[in-house]
From Swiss-Prot:
This is Small ribosomal subunit protein uS2c. Belongs to the universal ribosomal protein uS2 family. GO terms for molecular function: structural constituent of ribosome. Gene3D superfamilies: Glucose-6-phosphate isomerase like protein, domain 1, Helix hairpin bin. Keywords: Chloroplast, Plastid, Ribonucleoprotein, Ribosomal protein. GO terms for biological process: translation. One of its GO terms (cellular component) is chloroplast. The lineage of its organism: Eukaryota, Viridiplantae, Chlorophyta, core chlorophytes, Chlorophyceae. It holds the Pfam family Ribosomal_S2. The gene is rps2. It is found in: Plastid, Chloroplast. Its main location: plastid.
Length: 314
């Protein structure tokens, strides 16, 4: 031994040093494996039983549903993005077909991430201004108590958050004025101008009117139509989940689901499953809060009982 001291503690560390290090590394690996297995089991339970996606004894059934919902149809071969080539299965009549095996894998991944972020109570924003997805974006956001932009993405909505907050405040004041009938006392021209301004702001900002904090998760259904939104997410470091067709850029998304974004049935199917994942996450966080409150109450009653017994003894 190179080091020797009278201290028995140091001597023990000296002797068992290399062995203990090996032991801890093996132990850490075993713990990591266990943790991964637990995570996988939880993920499977969430996706199969709670979210009810891929909940069939015959896995072919899931692919049949995906085919019925037109998830596999891509864009013409000429419009294909180089980054999307690995997600393509084949082509017919000059149009690409998306690989549904990969789509299913990415849907499962997306559902897990959405459940996790919803459990953490993160602000979720849905973005989809294309005609097939606009309606479903609004309904999904309302169902999950999230926020949405489905008419037009105003440039700098995320970059210039301060100016957006000012616009939201302006909309609130205009709505209050209309409710309190203040415009009746104003000249006719000014009253009409204020009404038009209120209607214009509502058209663009109705989905994010009640937002309090900065959006932490963005779900996009039409990347080609909302490219500025995708670029802003990338610039601001906001986690972005996108439904990507064969003509989209996967580099602008943190997580993607390769699927048809032009079909209403395809977008509706995906958003329906996303909504279930968010609802599951929110429900789990509510349960956690309730359990925490129960535990704190129990602790308080125990401590009170101990104090009471001590006082009695005295």
């Amino acid at each position: 031994m190179t080091l020797s001291t009278n201290n028995s503690k140091n001597d023990f560390l000296d002797k068992t040093g290399p062995v203990s290090i090996l032991g801890t590394s093996k132990g850490k690996k075993a713990l990591l494996r266990r943790r991964l297995l637990i995570i996988q089991n939880v993920r499977n339970i969430l996706i199969k039983k709670i979210i009810n996606f891929d909940n069939f004894s015959n896995p072919i059934e899931t692919y049949k549903i995906m085919l019925r919902k037109s998830l596999h149809f891509g864009h013409p071969v000429i419009q294909c993005d180089s980054g999307m080539k690995k997600y393509i299965r084949g082509q017919s009549n000059g149009k690409h077909f998306i690989n549904l095996f990969r789509t299913k894998r990415y849907i499962r991944k997306a559902l897990w991430y959405l459940t996790k972020y919803a459990y953490k109570r993160k602000n979720i924003l849905f973005v989809g201004t294309a005609i097939p997805s606009a309606r479903y974006v609004a309904t999904t956001a309302l169902k999950t108590k999230s926020f949405f932009v489905n008419f037009r993405w105003l440039g700098g909505m995320l970059n210039n958050w301060k100016t957006l907050r000012k616009l939201l405040q302006k909309l609130k004041t205009l709505q209050k004025e209309q409710k309190n009938k203040i415009w009746k006392n104003l000249p006719k021209k000014e009253g009409i101008a204020r009404l038009k301004e209120k209607q214009r702001l509502e058209k663009y900002l109705k989905g994010i009117q009640m937002i309090k904090g900065f959006p932490e998760v963005v779900i996009m259904t039409s990347q080609t139509k909302d490219l500025s939104a995708a670029r802003e997410c990338k610039k601001m470091g906001i986690w972005n989940l996108s439904i990507l067709d064969t003509n989209c850029d996967p580099r602008l998304a943190d997580l993607m689901v390769p699927a048809n974004d032009d079909s209403a049935s395809s977008v509706k199917f995906l958003l329906f499953n996303f909504a279930k994942a968010i609802q599951a996450g929110r429900a789990l966080s509510v349960l956690k809060k309730k359990l925490k409150n129960k535990l704190t109450k129990k602790k308080q009653t125990k401590s009170r009982a101990k104090v009471f017994l001590k006082e009695k003894k005295l």
